Amino acid sequence: MRFGDFLDREKSLFSNDVDHHELKLKDEIKKSKFLIIGGAGTIGQAVTREIFSREPKKLDVVDINENNLVELVRDLRSSIGYISGEFDTFTLPIESDEFEILLQDRGPYDYVLNLSALKHVRNEKDPYTLSRMIDVNIFNTLKSLRLSQKMGAKKYFCVSTDKAANPTNLMGATKRIMEDFLQFEESATLVSSARFANVAFSDGSLLHGFQERFDKRQPLSAPNEIKRYFVTPKEAGELCLLSCIFGSHKEIFFPKLYPENDLISFTSLASRFLKSKGYKPIIMDSEDEARTFLHEITDGTEWPCYFFDSDTTGEKIAEEFYTKREDVNLNRFDKIGIVQMKKVLNNKTLAEFMSQMNTMKKSKLLMRDEIKNLIYKLVPELSHKETGKFLNERM
C-alpha cells in the first residue's frame, strides 16, 4: 500500500519545498556531520534515509532499539547502498555515560537531531511511565542540547507534536514544557523543532495497529468522533530535515494542513484500509461480538469493526498546530508554516519543576496527581479531562 494513495495525495506534501531547496540541501549535507538520536523509530528512520541519500560527511544514529537499528541498516544497504562518508549505528540511551563518551570520541557533529520521544497519550495512566515520559521528552532533550552546545554543534533539532498546541493530555503538555525549556536555553547552537501530525502507520499508531490486527485476523477498533491530520513517513522525514537545515533560531515548523480538507476520522481510515485489502467493514455492537465474528466468516468479504464513542482520558477531538497567542508565518514555504517560540515562563519556574521531579524520584515516591499538578503549574492552559478510563482498557 502506498501511503500517499491512502491519504489521497499524489505526491509528497512537501515536494515543492524540497525541490526548491534541493541544491542547498545536498551541498550542506555533503559537507556536514550528523548525529541522529532516536533514529530507529519511524520518524527517525525516515530522517536518516533523507540524510543518507544525500551523502553526508558523517552520519551516526543512536537508539535503544537494537532490532530496529539492524533493520534500518538493512533497509539502507538494500535500497540506497553505500555512501562515501562515514555511517554507523549505536545502541545507547541518552542518559548513559557511553553516550557522552561517543560524542567525545566521534564528535564534534555539525547537526544533532533528537527524534526520541514517548509519544502515546496512554503513557499518562501511571506515575512511573509518566515520570519516564518527562525524562525522555523534557530532561533528555535538555541534556542532549547542552551536550550539543558543549561540542560546538551548529544546529540542534528536536521533534515536538501537534498535541503541544492547546494540550488536552499530559503527553502534549510535556512537549509544550520541552518547547519552553528550549526557549530559555541561550547559546551559539541554533535550535529548531517541528510539530507533527500523525505519521501514517508509524510504530504503535492506530493505523499500524490496523495492519497488526489484520495480519493476526483480529477485528479493527477505533473511536467514532476522533479526527487527526496525517503525514507519510517520507513527509515526516522531509519536515524534520527542512526544519533542521533551514529553520531559524527557535522556530517550530508544522505542515500546512487545514481542518476543512485534511482532518480524517479513524473510522473512515479503517474503512479505507479494509477496502485496500479487498474487504468491507461490518460494524459490531461490542468488542465481544467483534472478536467472535471472525470465527464465523464464510464469504471472506467482510471484516468486523467495533467503533465506539471516545471515553478515555486525554483524548482530543481534533488536533491543531498553533494557538491564537502564537506568532505564525505562513509565507516562507509552500506547505510549511512556522511558529516562533515565545518566552511564556521564567527560568526559576522551570528550575523548580526540574528540582521537584528529581526530589520525587530520589524519595522513591511517585504519585500521579502530584506530577500532574507540577505540569499544570507550567502549562495552565492544559485542558485535561479525567474520565477514569485509559486506552489500555480498550481493544
Where are these regions (language model features)?
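Hydrophobic/small residue at the entry helix of a nucleotide-binding pocket
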Residues: 43
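Conserved Rossmann-fold NAD(P)-dependent oxidoreductase catalytic core, especially the SDR/UDP-sugar
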Residues: 114, 118-176, 184
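Conserved glycine-rich cofactor-binding loop
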Residues: 40
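A short, basic/flexible loop-to-alpha-helix module at the beginning of a structural domain
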Residues: 9-32
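Helix N-cap at the beta1-alpha1 junction of Rossmann-like dinucleotide-binding domains, i.e.
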Residues: 63-68
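Strand-loop microenvironment adjacent to phosphate/nucleotide-handling motifs in alpha/beta enzyme folds
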Residues: 6-7, 24, 28, 182-395
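NAD(P)H-binding glycine-rich loop region in Rossmannoid oxidoreductase-like domains
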Residues: 46, 50-61, 77, 83-85, ...
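Hydrophobic Val/Ile/Leu positions in short beta-strands of Rossmann-like dinucleotide-binding domains
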Residues: 36-37, 61
